[in-house]
From Swiss-Prot:
A biological process from GO: sulfate assimilation
Function: With CysD forms the ATP sulfurylase (ATPS) that catalyzes the adenylation of sulfate producing adenosine 5'-phosphosulfate (APS) and diphosphate, the first enzymatic step in sulfur assimilation pathway. APS synthesis involves the formation of a high-energy phosphoric-sulfuric acid anhydride bond driven by GTP hydrolysis by CysN coupled to ATP hydrolysis by CysD.
NCBIfam families given in the database record: CysN (TIGR02034), PRK05124.1 (NF003478), small_GTP (TIGR00231)
Keyword annotations from UniProtKB, A to Z: ATP-binding, GTP-binding, Nucleotide-binding, Nucleotidyltransferase, Transferase
Gene responsible for this protein: cysN
Region listing for G5, in residue ranges: 206-208
Binding site for GTP: 34-41, 113-117, 168-171
Transmembrane annotation, as ranges: none
Protein name per Swiss-Prot or TrEMBL: Sulfate adenylyltransferase subunit 1
Pathway linked to the protein: Sulfur metabolism; hydrogen sulfide biosynthesis; sulfite from sulfate: step 1/3
Length: 475
């Protein structure tokens, strides 16, 4: 057993008391990103090692793995703690997003270790979508690279406001203050073009040697700031969704017997209480909240991020994908929107194409009306393009098959985030963040009914020799 964990349990007076204490700790989700070989996996391994979160059998296995797959000679290769795929260990790189969990006396953490290779940028975007802070690693020998800029832009695009720039491998530049200062100035020059109000911090460190990771480095007396762990433990995270109006997307209708009918899902933003008047969109029907059912029993009030089942006073027609909000709020349905897109497929995104769209439990179809621009990651300039290639990032105009209730992604990631799904292969090919919904007055209405479009898709899928045209794509 982990001796630190055993000591913590003993200090709390038993397992039950320790678990209660864990529930009251704040949780920080963060990711590590940067260019390939900047030391992301090694940094996470060092954090786990120096906070003594590794079990004895894991440490023994790490010693053996370091001899077989390690790249650090006689030293422990801490990157092997998170590089779990065989291909990752053989190549010495991260391919998939690896999640790790650890806690200190002050906070709980969920880490997403994301790939650095450009071809795995889509994996990085996936990891960033649920995080509140990003650690951007920079190799002190190389400085700010294209992938550093790319990952910085994607992180801010996905709503991350806290960036920790970890200038790694300081041991390979003799712990030079001049090198640290130069890289910091280079990054700040670039960061001035990033959108939003950002909290940017810089930490010089060596993940391999442990300098400024969990303890202060004696090799860099010129740095008097916080260690990386201290930054993670003390950064104040203000969730945007807490201050936003109530949004409750219905995931499914919970009807275990004839006496109970509830609507299950996660409260995306705001708060809801028993007796509150709510409105169902897109129907516009209103009712009152009779009960709020949770895993721990009925509650009088719940807040954003909690999984709940709402029971209403009236028997009304509600299905998966519908949205509940405060009755006094006017939120019109829209049929068009401009969307920031991270494209994840080999086949480029082009105007005229149509895809299945999934947003907050709702699935519908959308047509690409046009691509306004693609962002040049090197300097964040916008350039006109005919299509959006793999790993491309740009602003796209979409028209949906039916009216949808949308928020801007920066206001509400749940009701403003969507994915593109290929209609034939059912593969996720892109991620979208609603930039601006277009009012219903200017949105184009669909020429065909949902039944006609579904029938058209089935005919083209099963009888391609008939040569039926794509109704949504050809409009």
């Amino acid at each position: 057993m982990n001796t630190v964990l055993a000591q913590q349990i003993a200090n709390e007076g038993g397992v039950e008391a320790w678990m209660i204490a864990q529930q009251h700790k704040s949780l920080l989700r963060f990711l590590t990103c940067g260019s390939v070989d900047d030391g992301k996996s090694t940094l996470i391994g060092r954090l786990l090692h120096d906070t003594r979160q590794i079990y004895e059998d894991q440490l023994s296995s790490l010693h053996n793995d370091s001899k077989r797959h390690g790249t650090q000679g006689e030293k422990l290769d801490l990157a092997l703690l998170v590089d779990g795929l065989q291909a990752e260990r053989e190549q010495g790189i991260t391919i998939d997003v690896a999640y790790r969990y650890f806690s200190t006396e002050k906070r709980k953490f969920i880490i997403a270790d994301t790939p650095g290779h450009e071809q795995y940028t889509r994996n990085m975007a996936t990891g960033a979508s649920t995080c509140e802070l990003a650690i951007l690693l920079i190799d002190a020998r190389k400085g700010v690279l294209d992938q550093t800029r790319r990952h910085s832009f994607i992180s801010t695009l996905l709503g991350i406001k806290h960036l920790v720039v970890a200038i790694n491998k300081m041991d390979l530049v003799d712990y030079s203050e001049e090198t640290f200062t130069r890289i910091r100035e280079d990054y700040l020059t670039f960061a001035g073009q990033l959108p939003g109000n950002l909290d940017i911090r810089f930490v010089p460190l060596s993940a391999l040697e442990g300098d400024n990771v969990a303890s202060q480095s004696e090799s860099m007396p010129w740095y008097s700031g916080l260690t990386l762990l201290e930054v993670l433990e003390t950064v104040e995270i203000q969730r945007v969704v807490d201050a936003q109006p109530m949004r409750f997307p219905v995931q499914y209708v919970n009807r275990p017997n004839l006496d109970f009918r509830g609507y299950a899902g996660m409260l995306a933003s705001g708060r809801v209480e028993v007796g509150q008047r709510v409105k169902v969109l897109p129907s516009g029907v209103e009712s009152n909240v009779a009960r709020i059912v949770t895993f721990d029993g009925d509650r009088e009030e719940v807040f954003a991020g909690e999984a709940i089942t709402l029971v209403l006073t009236d028997e009304i027609d509600i299905s998966r994908g519908d949205l509940l909000l405060a009755a006094d709020e006017a939120l019109p349905a829209v049929q068009s929107a401009s969307v920031d897109v991270v494209w994840m497929a080999e086949q480029p995104l082009s105007p005229g194409q149509s895809y299945d769209i999934k947003i907050a439990g709702k699935k519908t179809r959308a047509r690409v009306d046009g691509i306004r621009y693609q962002v040049d990651i090197n300097n964040l300039t916008q350039r006109e393009v005919e299509n959006l290639p793999l790993n491309g990032i740009g602003l796209v105009d979409l028209t949906f098959d039916e009216p949808l209730v949308l928020d801007r992604y920066q206001q509400n990631p749940v009701t403003g985030g969507l994915i593109f799904i290929d209609r034939l292969s059912n593969v996720t090919v892109g991620a979208g963040m609603v930039h601006e919904p277009v009012s219903q007055a200017t949105a184009a209405s669909s020429e065909f009914s949902a039944f006609e479009l579904e029938l058209n898709a089935l005919v083209r899928r099963h009888f391609p020799h008939w040569g039926a045209r794509d109704l949504l794509g050809d409009k």
